[in-house]
Curated annotation (Swiss-Prot):
InterPro entries in the cross-refs: ATP-synt_VA_C (IPR055190), ATPase_a/bsu_AS (IPR020003), ATPase_F1/V1/A1_a/bsu_nucl-bd (IPR000194), ATPase_V1-cplx_bsu (IPR005723), P-loop_NTPase (IPR027417), V-ATPase_su_B/beta (IPR022879)
SUPFAM superfamilies: P-loop containing nucleoside triphosphate hydrolases (SSF52540)
Annotated signal peptide: none
Gene source species: Gallus gallus (Chicken)
Lineage of source species: Eukaryota, Metazoa, Chordata, Craniata, Vertebrata
Name this polypeptide is given: V-type proton ATPase subunit B
Coiled coil: none
PANTHER family recorded: V-TYPE PROTON ATPASE SUBUNIT B, V-TYPE PROTON ATPASE SUBUNIT B, BRAIN ISOFORM
Subunit (UniProt): V-ATPase is a heteromultimeric enzyme made up of two complexes: the ATP-hydrolytic V1 complex and the proton translocation V0 complex. The V1 complex consists of three catalytic AB heterodimers that form a heterohexamer, three peripheral stalks each consisting of EG heterodimers, one central rotor including subunits D and F, and the regulatory subunits C and H. The proton translocation complex V0 consists of the proton transport subunit a, a ring of proteolipid subunits c9c'', rotary subunit d, subunits e and f, and two accessory subunits.
Described function: Non-catalytic subunit of the V1 complex of vacuolar(H+)-ATPase (V-ATPase), a multisubunit enzyme composed of a peripheral complex (V1) that hydrolyzes ATP and a membrane integral complex (V0) that translocates protons. V-ATPase is responsible for acidifying and maintaining the pH of intracellular compartments and in some cell types, is targeted to the plasma membrane, where it is responsible for acidifying the extracellular environment. Essential for the proper assembly and activity of V-ATPase.
Length: 453
């Protein structure tokens, strides 16, 4: 946490040409000689050359306002869209306010993303924190953009979606991304008409490293203001958390701290928790913060410290798979390592449909067996497989082609997703569907997929 604490100690400096600079404390050494080492957060990487220094006597606060929606800021919170400065309604500490755990509300409203692999088998609740585990070259940005386009609340009546925009906002924070990624999200928000409800914070790859530590906290402070003061439902997209963790390692090394696993600081778990835990719902407030951090796993390694520690803190993960991507399946979401820990409370009768949990469990079981059969087929050949094995193979192919695969602008309701699931399960005789109760089978198994709800 030392690197983050350092980033909160600010000074205002004047450069040799009289230019004003803002800097954050990097190291403190009063034993050999009384000195503070600072690093600029508003200029290029490297030491800050200043001729005068003014201590602010305060921690780093950010101006917040509802007018920040529709605006683009740099990683330090300065407008970069040629618009006026923000007329602040308040100045808030970027580390946020501690929330009494007793005042947190358990997330129970499902967010419909329109993506079957998520809605059907890894449902997201409003107020949840669930990361996208991806890797270099995979379409994680496209998936996140599709979720932003299509996300809405499932109403308790049939086939009704809540797309109301007056109380919905998106806060997008980019850390260490290239210009192409920043342009992709900005143009996508503009094209689907949601830019007025989006606040962007962009720290590009050529921006200062220490700014990368501040950017997600600026975004989350803004999100907390919009959620708890303006009572909006806020979706926070953070990309790329791997760049953030590497910035943390760089600042930690500059401070000569004792390194931990793979050179990352020992407090990285605690530091990531200070970001991820700023999601959820609070008693007495109508707003919510749903977090979808995106991280790229180095060398596709899920045991790397960044995805490993993230998985401990967050409530599940959405796993983007390279093998599915290589087979031209979009979105390439592998449902087996994916998980949503809050799914059980967001689905079922009165929220989605009473068969939702049973269909999800049976699809998981059949897909897992299908994967085993596929591996066995590679060893013994198709001729050695039983008739049941061939059914699982057929299910495997149709599941990936019809259930997981869909278009980037295809928005399926949760009811359409469940109907596709039943179509696939009808490949098997009723006796083989052992994870679905007989009463549910009697009601849904014989039904024609075109039947009305």
């Amino acid at each position: 946490m030392a690197a983050v604490a350092a980033a909160r100690r600010m000074v205002n400096g004047a450069g040799p040409g009289g230019a004003r600079e803002q800097a954050a404390a990097l190291t403190r050494d009063f034993l050999s000689q009384p000195r503070l080492t600072y690093k600029t957060v508003s200029g290029v990487n490297g030491p800050l050359v200043i001729t005068s220094c003014e201590f602010t006597g305060d921690i780093l606060r950010t101006p917040v306002s509802e007018d920040m929606l529709g605006r683009v800021f740099n990683g330090s919170g300065k407008p970069i869209d040629r618009g006026p400065a923000v007329l602040a309604e308040d100045f808030l500490d970027i580390m946020g306010q501690p929330i009494n755990p007793q005042c947190r509300i358990y997330p129970e409203e499902m967010i419909q993303t329109g993506i079957s692999a998520i809605d059907g088998m890894n449902s997201i609740a409003r107020g949840q924190k669930i990361p996208i585990f991806s890797a270099a070259g995979l379409p994680h940005n496209e998936i996140a953009a599709q979720i932003c386009r299509q996300a809405g609340l499932v109403k308790k009546s049939k086939d009704v979606m809540d797309y109301s925009e007056e109380n919905f906002a998106i806060v997008f924070a980019a850390m260490g991304v290239n210009m192409e990624t920043a342009r992709f999200f900005k143009s996508d928000f503009e094209e689907n008409g949601s830019m007025d409800n989006v606040c962007l914070f962009l720290n590009l790859a050529n921006d200062p490293t220490i700014e990368r530590i501040i950017t997600p906290r600026l975004a989350l402070t803004t999100a907390e203001f919009l959620a708890y003061q303006c009572e909006k439902h806020v979706l926070v997209i953070l990309t790329d958390m791997s760049s953030y963790a590497e910035a943390l390692r760089e600042v930690s090394a500059a401070r000569e701290e004792v390194p931990g696993r793979r050179g990352f600081p020992g407090y990285m778990y605690t530091d990531l928790a200070t970001i991820y835990e700023r999601a959820g719902r609070v008693e007495g407030r109508n707003g919510s913060i749903t977090q979808i951090p995106i991280l790229t796993m180095p060398n596709d390694d899920i045991t790397h410290p960044i995805p490993d520690l993230t998985g401990y803190i967050t409530e599940g993960q959405i796993y983007v798979d390279r093998q599915l991507h290589n087979r031209q399946i979009y979105p390439p979401i592998n449902v087996l390592p994916s998980l949503s820990r809050l799914m059980k409370s967001a689905i079922g009768e009165g929220m989605t449909r009473k068969d939702h949990a049973d269909v999800s469990n049976q699809l998981y079981a059949c897909y897992a067996i299908g994967k085993d059969v596929q591996a066995m087929k590679a060893v013994v050949g198709e001729e050695a497989l039983t008739s049941d094995d061939l059914l699982y193979l057929e299910f495997l192919q149709k599941f990936e082609k019809n259930f997981i695969a869909q278009g980037p602008y295809e928005n399926r309701t949760v009811y359409e997703t469940l109907d596709i699931g039943w179509q696939l399960l009808r490949i098997f005789p009723k006796e083989m569907l052992k994870r679905i109760p007989q009463t549910t089978l009697a009601e849904f198994y014989p039904r024609d997929s075109t039947a009305k709800h």
